[in-house]
Amino acid sequence: MLQKTSHFMRQANLINGEWVQADSGQTIDVNNPATGLKIGTVPKAGKAETRRAIEAAGEAFKSWRKTTALERSKLLRKLHDAMMDNQDVLAELLTIEQGKSLFESKGEIGSAAAYILWFAEEGRRTYGDIVPSPWGDRRILVTKEPVGVIAAITPWNFPSSMLARKLGPALAAGCTAVVKPATQTPYSGLAWGALAEEVGFPKGVVNILTGAAGEIGDEICANPLVSKITFTGSTEVGKLLIQKSSVTVKKVSMELGGNAPFIVFDDADIDRAVTGAITAKYRNSGQTCVCTNRFLVQAGVYDKFVERLAAASNALKVGSGLEEGVQQGPLIDEKAVEKVEELIADATSKGGKVVVGGKRHALGGSFFQPTVIADATPKMRFMKEEIFGPVAPVFKFETEEQAIALANDTEFGLACYFYTGDLGRAFRVMEGLKYGMVGVNEGLITTPEAPFGGVKESGLGKEGGHQGIEDYLDTKYVCIGGLGL
């Protein structure tokens, strides 16, 4: 590991401007998924440490909320610049703890920085309103104010960019934050604390702690000082957080599970569709909430698409993310590999055909072969369950109506993709799909300028776009009377 990378690898929690260990002295091991070897530890904090972090954020909020939008924007721009200045070392740290390729890690750091820059600008545009009054002697104002202390819980698959989507709008709006990164990838989260310190954020504005998820989550949900929870993760955990936080009626933003369909119509550009499919399926080894879970291909091009997708999948280079040219790293852990194996076994027992892959990779550990399964049917678990691995099941359909029905046959509604050369069909299908995000002839659609988020059981709220900062603001109505007008 590079010396500078070690500077950002903080094996302590940041609470009120101090780097501290857990009260109990207990730690959690952090392993490199590519090697299985321990790379360090982080504190195993609990309720008491979480409470102190929340109190520190609450105290810091008193002054932070009074800073101007311009002052906050300047600090966020410095944070953006610091991230880009250290892009290579932050990417290396991310790859070491998460496993994805350095190419993807650099892209994630760049994306995270882009979100910070976007919200540095959006924070200056949280406009209020002057409403025409129905009374001649009164005036009506509508203002926007920061909600207060927010708690952000982030996942292991994109440990830097997911935090950027939450910290960026929160800090821009004038909120303070308590952050809990995933225990599998804590260093990318803790690195934000080091960066925030270095660019001059006041103590207590950003607090980051690792530890027992249940204890930290319970304190966040129950503590009345926390005004909002923002979470990216499983639908199961999201529902639990909503339920527990309802006692104190907190605002919540939830970016939860997905079951993304990728539809290919007969009139599609097949080469373009395959290129998009590789991106939409295999980014981060299939471990993304918006990655394709089900390929739905029209009968007329089914065989051609399967053949080309299989060839492209088989050509992907698998290996340690630190190696040059690697496109597929390991899965996050053994449990993830076992889940993929279960889903493949279920598919083959129900008539599915493994075209390429289907097994653990010769590299061992949690490496898995990019896999394409033909003759997939709705009876297979793929239809309802999120794979979170490098497996591409391909279903066949006959009509446009059937494709839309199959795509919508899920409780999830995060992202979806489809390829067609017919403009009229593009609008019909786009309007018929019950998803928060739709890629038309594109397999990679995420950008800070657009609102990211789902419908149905895929979540609540939006991250990115001008909508992204609204969840961190309260709207206040002010009626001014006695003006003697």
Enumerate the language-model features and the residues they cover.
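Hydrophobic face of amphipathic alpha-helices that form TPR/SEL1-like repeat modules
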Residues: 1-34
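Conserved C-terminal structural/oligomerization subdomain of aldehyde/semialdehyde dehydrogenase
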Residues: 35-41, 226, 263, 317-318, ...
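Residue-level signal for inorganic ion chemistry
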Residues: 36, 72, 94, 116, ...
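Short, well-ordered beta-strand elements within core beta-sheets of diverse protein domains
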Residues: 38-45, 59-66, 152, 262-265, ...
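Glycine-rich loop-to-alpha-helix module at the N-terminal edge of alpha/beta enzyme cores
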Residues: 39-126, 137
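Rossmann-like NAD(P) dinucleotide-binding subdomain of oxidoreductase/dehydrogenase enzymes
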Residues: 84, 128-272, 397
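A short hydrophobic/small-residue beta-strand
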Residues: 176-178, 354, 437
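ALDH superfamily catalytic-core signature
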Residues: 236-377, 440
